[in-house]
UniProtKB/Swiss-Prot annotation:
One of its GO terms (cellular component) is mediator complex. Residues 123-141 have a biased composition (Acidic residues). InterPro entries: Mediator_Med11 (IPR019404). This is Mediator of RNA polymerase II transcription subunit 11. Keywords: Activator, Coiled coil, Developmental protein, Nucleus, Transcription, Transcription regulation. Residues 146-155 have a biased composition (Low complexity).
Length: 188
């Protein structure tokens, strides 16, 4: 399997596994030499046996540490916690924040309409208009504005929450208010 050259983290992890595999091979060779030396009638010097034993201990510690690190990484990936290369949590937090922002815009618009029923259009600042132009670029990939943005800006009821709430509830509220205004005119 050829590693993806565009992902250096993955390449490093695969290289670490290959190095660990080579360490396991060397460890097996050391163990084989120790067992062969012990099986001989005439044993080799004590220094050679100690060198092989120390080399084996060093290699087994390296392999254990590397395999533990790899297993810990895989356990993080499996349970979905944050790990190298994961953007799921960040994306989820961003979407949650956008949802909360649109909900706040909608509630604020309703409060403004409740407090000042004569004002059909909320007061927009230069900053809100700039935010709305950013929403246009995000909503339409080809640069064309979405239908909710177009309808809200043409009838004058849009304002700073272009994509924050649908146009259906606004039109129902406006039609309800117009009916009460018409009823008042008829009574007079």
């Amino acid at each position: 399997m050829e590693p993806n050259p565009s992902d250096p983290v993955l390449t490093d992890r695969i290289q670490a596994i290959v190095t660990t595999e080579k360490s396991i091979d060397e460890m097996m060779k050391c163990a084989r030499e120790i067992i062969q030396d012990l099986g001989k009638e005439k044993q080799i010097g004590k220094n050679k046996m100690e060198d092989n034993a120390n080399n084996f201990k060093k290699l087994i510690t390296q392999v254990e540490n590397e395999l533990s690190a790899q297993m810990q990484y895989l356990s993080h990936v499996c349970v979905g916690s944050s790990h190298q290369g994961s953007t799921f949590g960040v994306l989820q937090n961003s979407l949650l924040a956008q949802s909360g922002l649109s909900s706040l815009h909608s509630e604020l618009f309703q409060i403004v309409r409740y407090l000042d029923p004569t004002s059909d259009e909320p007061q927009t600042t230069e900053e809100d208009e700039e935010d709305g132009s950013d929403d246009l670029n995000e909503d339409g990939a080809d640069g064309a504005p979405s239908s909710t943005v177009t309808s809200s800006t043409t009838d004058g009821s849009g304002g700073g929450d272009d994509a924050a709430s649908s146009s259906a509830p606004r039109s129902q509220e406006e039609s309800g208010r117009q009916m009460t205004d018409d009823d008042d005119d008829m009574e007079q």
